[in-house]
């Protein structure tokens, strides 16, 4: 139910939104052209993330570098299945690892010493060492859960 100026409107059933390749923001082709990076490999290594972040900063005329390039990093570190995408559509959920809310309690703690999360943290550190200001986007609990389990559960 949604309240609008004193009126109640029934919104009906919740509709599933099928997130597809066409729905992804990704990284614009003018950013990736000429960099010699291969995707999705570029989303998984410190040095390529540093390069991408700096080029995005330059192209956007921003004052900060941003990491990571998706909202799946934390869920992946907990065992989430991630589709790393390509140069057009970045990393996104690839499937659910939980089919019941109780299964969430059995997921491992995040391990910051391996995988893409470690590489992203190293990229952040390297950017800072190079004098860059970095915004590190941290996913919240609902975003993380959305990668791990279908919201219907």
Residues of each region from the PLM?
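Active-site-proximal, glycine-rich beta->alpha crossover segments in alpha/beta enzymes
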Residues: 2, 83-153
